[in-house]
């Protein structure tokens, strides 16, 4: 196949007309040409390399890899570096093998980073354990391009033997190591990076990202469903101040400074966790457009999802050059970025209207071993007339929480929530046969009635539930048990849910059906008073102990700064 078109050369940062030859799924020849008029070209618009999401957990879309691919190609995405950390916590190597095999059923490039922290910590119950020897074998797979995010930064800093052994396996094979180091700085950051950990996607402010970048880390700018860091990291005034304070500022001609200001400074744009309700509206194409709105140059933004991740992970895609796999998209222009066609290995997979491949239904043995619950399971006892309690404060669009305190009344020996002050109940129910339950309090949801529950609860994916009363919490959890996973919302006799029977994380359903059901749940939660844009996703991160400041696992309330359990009721 041969055609002529304008193409974006991400190696030279330029756009020019070229004759492009594709053979056997690879670019055979790229020849710049001279034209008198655009009508001489075979294809109108601009040819770009296919987009690469270099850090995403497919399970967070609630879709199988194949269903994800069917949706993503509509938006110009042809490749992902995915970390199957979620299903690995549920089902270990069987879960990882499922993701790899399912990904092979569709024309799309799935590269895998091997989960490094299963379980994420020793302070929670997961469905599996991946030790250093197992990780070493998984890293030898052809599909494995990196060691997944090292969330146990205390283990790295303190020289934990097993943690360091996992890192050594990646070093021996010459594979990059992804990081996870929220708010880590100074000497602790130096120790962390000394172990060859080369990326971070957890930066939530410009100063944090700059420190890591200047020390040699590659920064992933995250724009997901729950965590959105692009505005903070692409802030124009911060970029301007950075370059003004740069040692070379006084030597820069004005035209050079003007160009520098529109460079992103950082390296990749990633999703991390993306709900289907957001994904059906767009993927990296929308993130690129947002970056452009934040005054990042279009070519630089596109390079953050093409050649930059390709180079870092040693992928044979990400640029339109001889010998690389012919993954490319046709767009109308660099600003509107409307996807006209998408190609993978030289074959059209999206023609502007329809996806040109089918997805078959798949099965996976579930892991849901938990007994039905009663309202009494969600009570916190106290003999005093009131109790001073620790409270988790969550924020819209953020994974980070804050620790707060509240004084709550007791009734019949149980501590009561305070709906007027938005102090609700939260609990985590272990789903792997132990049936343990930890209860606590949370603020930020603003529910005025009912309860919501989820079997998506990072990272061990036990059941997490937030509610205004114990009875609705029990019923919401029992609904999930009946469905073998998913999301549920309950208020008295009212009940609605989205079943996720594949490991309690995913479904075979079409993306638009999933999105429609989830949107309905979001609307119901809003009708119940919830102010969060993505309440189920926000709730799912309340059990993620590796992100500060206070979270909850099936073993209790947890101080993520000092890595220790704390009492719900203060002494």
Swiss-Prot record:
GO terms for biological process: adenine catabolic process. It comes from the Archaea. Its EC number is 3.5.4.2. Its cofactor is Mn(2+). GO terms for molecular function: adenine deaminase activity. Coiled coil: none annotated. Keywords: Hydrolase, Manganese. Transmembrane segments: none annotated. It catalyses: adenine + H2O + H(+) = hypoxanthine + NH4(+). Pfam families: Adenine_deam_C, Amidohydro_1. Belongs to the metallo-dependent hydrolases superfamily. Adenine deaminase family. This is Adenine deaminase. It comes from Methanobrevibacter smithii (strain ATCC 35061 / DSM 861 / OCM 144 / PS). The gene is ade.
């Amino acid at each position: 196949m041969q055609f002529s078109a304008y193409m974006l050369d991400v190696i030279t940062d330029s756009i020019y007309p070229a004759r492009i030859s594709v053979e056997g799924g690879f670019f055979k020849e790229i020849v710049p040409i001279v034209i008198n008029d655009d009508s001489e070209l075979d294809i109108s618009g601009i040819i770009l390399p296919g987009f690469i999401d270099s850090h995403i957990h497919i399970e967070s879309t609630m879709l199988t890899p194949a269903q994800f691919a069917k949706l993503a190609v509509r938006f110009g995405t042809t490749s992902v570096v995915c970390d199957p950390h979620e299903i690995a916590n549920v089902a270990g190597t069987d879960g990882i093998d499922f993701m790899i095999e399912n990904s092979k059923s569709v024309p799309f490039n799935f590269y895998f980073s091997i989960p490094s922290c299963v379980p994420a910590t020793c302070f929670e119950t997961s469905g599996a354990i991946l030790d250093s020897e197992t990780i070493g074998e998984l890293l030898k797979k052809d599909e494995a391009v990196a060691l997944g995010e090292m969330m146990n930064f205390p283990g790295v800093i303190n020289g934990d033997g097993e943690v360091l052994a996992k890192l050594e396996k990646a070093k021996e094979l010459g594979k990059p190591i992804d990081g996870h180091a929220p708010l880590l700085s100074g000497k602790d950051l130096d120790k962390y990076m000394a172990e060859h950990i080369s990326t971070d996607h957890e930066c939530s402010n410009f100063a944090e990202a700059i420190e890591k970048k200047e020390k040699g880390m590659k920064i992933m700018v995250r724009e997901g469903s729950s965590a959105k860091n692009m505005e903070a990291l692409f802030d124009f005034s911060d970029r301007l101040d950075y370059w003004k304070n740069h040692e070379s500022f006084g030597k820069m001609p004005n035209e050079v400074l003007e160009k520098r200001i529109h460079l992103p400074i950082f390296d990749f744009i990633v999703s991390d966790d993306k709900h289907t309700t957001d994904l059906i509206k767009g993927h990296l194409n929308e993130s690129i457009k947002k970056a452009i709105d934040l005054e990042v140059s279009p070519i630089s933004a596109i390079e953050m999802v093409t050649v930059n991740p390709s180079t870092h992970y040693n992928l044979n895609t990400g640029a339109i050059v001889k010998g690389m796999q012919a993954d490319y998209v046709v767009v109308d222009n660099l600003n509107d970025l409307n996807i006209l066609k998408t190609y993978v290995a030289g074959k059209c997979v999206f023609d502007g209207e329809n996806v040109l491949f089918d997805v078959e239904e798949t099965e996976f043995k579930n892991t849901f071993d938990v007994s039905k619950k009663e309202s009494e399971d969600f009570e916190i006892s106290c003999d005093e007339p009131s109790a001073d309690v620790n409270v988790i404060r969550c924020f819209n669009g953020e994974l980070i929480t804050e620790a707060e305190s509240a004084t709550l009344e007791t009734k019949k020996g149980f501590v009561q929530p305070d709906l007027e002050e938005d102090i609700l109940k939260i609990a985590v129910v272990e789903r792997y046969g132990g049936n343990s339950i930890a209860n606590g309090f949370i603020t930020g949801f603003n529910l005025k009635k009912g309860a919501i529950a989820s079997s998506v609860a990072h990272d061990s994916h036990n059941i997490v539930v937030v509610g205004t009363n114990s009875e609705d919490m029990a019923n919401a959890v029992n609904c999930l048990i009946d469905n073998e996973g998913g999301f549920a919302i309950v208020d008295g006799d009212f009940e609605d849910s989205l079943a996720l029977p594949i490991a309690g994380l995913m479904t075979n359903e079409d993306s638009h059906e999933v999105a429609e059901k989830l949107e309905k749940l979001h609307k119901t939660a809003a009708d119940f008073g919830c102010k969060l844009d993505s309440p189920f996703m926000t709730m799912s991160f309340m059990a993620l102990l590796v992100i500060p400041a206070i979270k909850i696992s099936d073993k209790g309330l947890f101080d993520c700064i000092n890595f220790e359990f704390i009492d719900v009721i203060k002494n």
